[in-house]
Amino acid sequence: KKALILEKARGHNIDSFFVDHKNKKREVFDKEISQRLKEKEVDLILLIGFMRILSGGFVSEWSGKIINVHPSLLPKHAGGMNEDVHKQVLKAGDKETGCTVHLVTAQVDEGPILVQKRCPVLEGDTVGSLKEKVQKLEGEAFVEVIRGWEKNEQ
């Protein structure tokens, strides 16, 4: 309801909506979202900070139209979410990190990669500093993918 992305969308006159997932089975939630997306005649679904795994039925129904951003250079640290990924990067001693924008498939974080953005992991970096750097890259990566998508749609 109060997600920053919804506020930003409204600020740019982009139609957006919220569907509460609490106390709903995944399939029920996904059907409700799918219905709303069809009503809005949506062409592209962006998963930004979406901390849920979509059902196979939803992914199949919207195949080729769902894009996710993952806070690592996939396939490294696949399956992790948010700060856990940055902890894994530090624990592994990775020299670089970044983000991956990919098409969503039934297999989590295994869809075709559309864009990867990289940044160095510096001595003294923390989970917080990596999160900040990677989130900046995520925004850049999404813009790049959306612009490319628009060109291909025309």
Could you say what each language-model-derived stretch is?
Residues 1-154:
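One-carbon transfer enzymes
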